[in-house]
Amino acid sequence: MIPGELHIADGIIELNVNREKVIVMVINNGDRPIQVGSHFHFYEVNNALFFNRNFALGFRLNVPSGTSIRFEPGQTREVELVRYSGELKIVGFCKKIMGKLSK
């Protein structure tokens, strides 16, 4: 094996199988593009993004790790969110939630 070399299994690798997911419609009401990363707590994204935040509590974008979605000014798009797993401790981000979520 070469340092840094990756051995990836053959076939399709499915992400977030059997995890709770929701789809939300998001509108960028701002005058600048907004980019949201794969593991950012979607409930706490920029306030210029308009959507029903109640559906996003405890969820993140359902995209591969390290990627993001960009919302252009005035753009409306549908995104799929996936529930965080583990202990559900949400800390940091924009400090709107600083603790453990109930399941």
Curated annotation (Swiss-Prot):
EC code(s) of this entry: 3.5.1.5
CDD domains cross-referenced by the UniProt entry: Urease_beta
One GO MF term: urease activity
Transmembrane residue ranges: none
Organism superkingdom: Bacteria
Localization (cell): Cytoplasm
Listed pathway(s): Nitrogen metabolism; urea degradation; CO(2) and NH(3) from urea (urease route): step 1/1
Main location: cytoplasm
Enzyme class: hydrolase
GO cellular component terms, A-Z: urease complex
InterPro entries cross-referenced by the UniProt entry: Urease_beta-like, Urease_betasu_sf, Urease_subunit
Record key words, sorted: Cytoplasm, Hydrolase
BP GO annotations: urea catabolic process
Reactions catalysed, as given in the entry: urea + 2 H2O + H(+) = hydrogencarbonate + 2 NH4(+)
Subunit details: Heterotrimer of UreA (gamma), UreB (beta) and UreC (alpha) subunits. Three heterotrimers associate to form the active enzyme.
Family: Belongs to the urease beta subunit family.
NCBIfam families cross-referenced by the UniProt entry: PRK13203.1, urease_beta
Record's protein name: Urease subunit beta
Upper taxonomic lineage: Bacteria, Pseudomonadati, Pseudomonadota, Gammaproteobacteria, Enterobacterales
Encoding gene, per UniProt annotation: ureB
